Amino acid sequence: MRRVSVTEKTVSLPIANSDHPNTKILIEAGAYDLAIEQLQQATAEDSNPNDLYNLGLCFEAIGDYGLAHTTYREAWEADSENLLYAQGLGRIERLRHENPQLKRQLDSR
């Protein structure tokens, strides 16, 4: 399996409000693996769309665009009126269209 490398940029993205304030701190600190662990536990018990969005944000930050796309979509499907969720999904879709290798990777899932 070959990993697709997308150009790395530093951007500031909004973090959704959560009932789990620790996860926001972890995301802001760049401790994405710990945040993923906590958010996966939280969403297994209650699939709050804000937590799903934040989980997608963590996956996007570590370069797992397939899981980011899946969790952003789950958040958006739970609340399609939320612009934040649509923006997360849109970022991954844009990357998919701009990078043919990434498109193949996402399509193979």
Kindly give the residue locations of the regions a language model identified:
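Charge-rich, low-complexity intrinsically disordered segments
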Residues: 58-85
